[in-house]
Amino acid sequence: TTPEPITLHRTLAAAKANRITHAAMEASSHGLDQRRLDGVTLTAAGFTNFTQDHLDYHHTFEAYFDAKAGLFARVLPDNGIAVINIDDPRGLDMAAIAAARGQEVITVGRDGGDLYLSAQRFDSTGQDVRFDYKGKAYTARLPLIGGFQADNVMLACGLVIACGADPARVFETLPHLGTVRGRMQLAATRDNGAAVFVDYAHT
């Protein structure tokens, strides 16, 4: 989750002191609601999805959506770039909030967008994907299991491009990605070729 403000700012200050120029972090709905990110200057921010998680905290879908929308309505500066997954039913609502602030919006999705997933083929150790960005196709091997991984990678690519990276170089790095421990992590391959995974995800 998003650290409390003092820890967050201390961590970012230490990163800057160590000449780290870029950072990525989660902007959790709890953290946004509790204003833990206030005062952090962001270049870009992304919206992945809106599900029924965390209703124990927010109580209503409206309050939960408003908390997430705070990332674009309050935290991301007017000159920031919003990367929005428009496959999610609330994606266009979030894009409208960002656009109303004057933020540049980059849309991502499987069914179209500025950056979209146009092909995907799975095997036992990962997937081959094709992304299209601004009329150009980029193919890559993702050593990650699960269709959702391509969705997450697509949004992450949008964020990195929004921060000024060359798109071709962004897509060239994808084969070097590693999985998060415990999230569809390839643990072993049996003698018969069957893959064994560890997965603690619970959405």
PLM region descriptions:
Residues 28, 50, 201:
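Conserved Walker B
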Residues 2, 55-58, 201:
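Charge-dense, low-complexity intrinsically disordered segments
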Residues 1-28:
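Conserved nucleotide-sensing/catalytic segment adjacent to the nucleotide-binding pocket
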